């Protein structure tokens, strides 16, 4: 029902600081940890494609963020594709290096989902919810220190981690999905299908709700 702007600095591929791996192309043959089906999985697929590699050129290690962090710290994997705040926590702990972020990978931002029958019956309310989320994000940025303190307490993380997390987030206005975002997400769906990660092709346009009362770009 809605989408955030991309946050290319908030998702990365990490390697140990002293790793000989200096480029995505050099991940060939190496173990890379990430959560299957996640945005980090998408980041990795796009980075490999950009570097001229196939998914089969690496050794994927499917792990939750907590387990991936442990495996990475213990040297059981060679690289780790991950998002914030896990990325910020690892970065501030030290001994890691960013191999690649999403700056030039044309990813979408996070999506907000709703049951289609509900959205179709309550379009005005859905738009109000998206606007409220956007206002909350603006408040988080305008009252930065209060937000850092509150989020650190709520998420159980140190304040410097939250500060880094916020630094990686551009201002976020959440809006209904338009044609350009749908096209980018279609690329992701096709990429997952081409790598046999989903069983059949997905037409993203059929999965997107648009408010009928809002004029705009058609999918």
For every predicted segment, state its role:
Residues 60-61, 66-153:
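Pocket-lining segment of extracytoplasmic ligand-binding domains
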Residues 29, 92, 209:
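Phosphate-coordinating loops and pocket residues in cytosolic domains that bind phosphorylated ligands
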Residues 51-53, 93-94, 155, 195-196:
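Residues at alpha-helix termini
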Residues 190-219:
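Conserved C-terminal helix/tail region of periplasmic/extracytoplasmic solute-binding proteins
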Residues 120-199:
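Secondary-structure end/capping motifs
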Residues 1-54, 59-62, 78-81, 99, ...:
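Short, glycine-/small- and polar/acidic-enriched structural segments
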């Amino acid at each position: 029902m809605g989408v955030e702007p991309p946050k290319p600095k908030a998702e990365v591929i990490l390697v140990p600081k002293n790793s000989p791996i200096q480029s995505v192309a050099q991940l060939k043959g190496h173990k890379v940890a990430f959560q299957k089906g996640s945005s980090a999985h998408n980041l990795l697929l796009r980075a490999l494609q950009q570097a001229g590699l196939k998914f089969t050129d690496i050794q994927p290690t499917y792990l939750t963020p907590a387990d991936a962090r442990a495996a990475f710290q213990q040297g059981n994997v060679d690289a780790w594709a991950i998002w914030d705040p896990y990325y910020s926590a690892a970065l501030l702990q030290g001994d890691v290096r960013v191999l690649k972020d999403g700056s030039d990978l044309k990813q979408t931002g996070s999506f907000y989902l709703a049951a289609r029958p509900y959205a179709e019956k309550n379009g005005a309310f859905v738009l109000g919810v998206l606007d409220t989320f956007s206002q909350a994000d603006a408040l988080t940025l305008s009252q930065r220190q209060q937000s850092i303190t509150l989020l650190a307490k709520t998420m159980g993380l140190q304040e410097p981690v939250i500060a880094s997390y916020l630094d990686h987030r551009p201002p976020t206005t959440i809006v209904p999905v338009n044609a350009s975002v749908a096209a980018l997400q279609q690329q992701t769906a096709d990429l997952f299908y081409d790598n046999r990660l989903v069983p059949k092709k997905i037409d993203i346009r059929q999965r997107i709700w648009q408010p009928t009362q809002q004029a705009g770009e058609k999918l």
